[in-house]
């Protein structure tokens, strides 16, 4: 089975659709249901206690885990001077803590099944961007966690991928900024194209591990 966090919207939703079409059992972990999921485990990933319950629900399904894709995330666009402690907790809990705790709670089954792990970071986790200090810090942290996972699982059959796409069109950016325009004038990538790229990485032979991939928007004119 394919476990996807945050499959109710955006990239997670497109991934769920692709895997459903491929005949895989899809398990969504998020606050809202995913129409493509075979199992919806509705939990708030900001809360550690709910993540533990979600992990137990996954294990109770009794099926091998093929991949865990940590896709759930929230965006923060706030200038320095206006960042609050609550905002830091909101972003770090969803973007970093949730992935760490979910993997930690499932690690024995992950090793047993040789399950792959994909942590969806961002190009914001590779360089600094104006007004994205908290979001950027969360994505840098997620990349750090991924690097540690790669070391800890290097002698297993589990592949660990840091997936770092640039901006693609979802409701996430529009909700945070009130618009859907790119700052540099390039066109947004499509979530379905980004999802296909991620799936293709996991479709590679098991002895091929793409440790990190960066996908940038490219001007077409």
Residue map of PLM features:
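N-terminal Rossmann NAD(P)H-binding glycine-rich loop of SDR-like oxidoreductase domains
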Residues: 8, 16
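Residue(s) in the substrate-gating loop at a strand-loop-helix junction
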Residues: 122
């Amino acid at each position: 089975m394919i476990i996807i966090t945050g499959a109710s919207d955006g990239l997670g939703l497109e991934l769920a659709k692709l895997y459903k079409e491929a005949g895989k059992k899809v398990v969504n972990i998020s606050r809202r249901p995913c129409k493509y999921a075979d199992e919806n485990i509705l939990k708030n990933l900001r809360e550690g206690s709910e993540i533990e319950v979600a992990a137990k629900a996954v294990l109770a399904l009794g099926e091998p885990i093929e991949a865990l894709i940590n896709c759930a995330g929230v965006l923060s666009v706030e200038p320095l001077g206006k960042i609050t402690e609550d905002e830091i907790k909101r972003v770090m809990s969803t973007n970093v803590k949730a992935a760490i705790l979910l993997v930690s709670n499932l690690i024995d089954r992950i090793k047993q099944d040789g399950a792959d792990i994909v942590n969806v970071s961002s190009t914001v986790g590779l360089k600094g961007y104006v007004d994205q200090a908290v979001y950027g810090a969360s994505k840098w942290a997620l990349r750090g966690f991924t690097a540690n996972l790669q070391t800890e699982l290097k002698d297993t059959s589990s592949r660990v991928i840091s997936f770092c796409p640039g901006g693609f069109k979802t409701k996430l950016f529009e909700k945070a900024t009130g618009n859907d325009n790119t700052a540099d004038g390039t066109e947004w990538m499509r979530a379905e194209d980004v999802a296909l790229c991620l799936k293709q990485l996991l479709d590679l032979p098991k002895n091929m591990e793409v440790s990190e991939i960066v996908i940038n928007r490219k001007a077409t004119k």
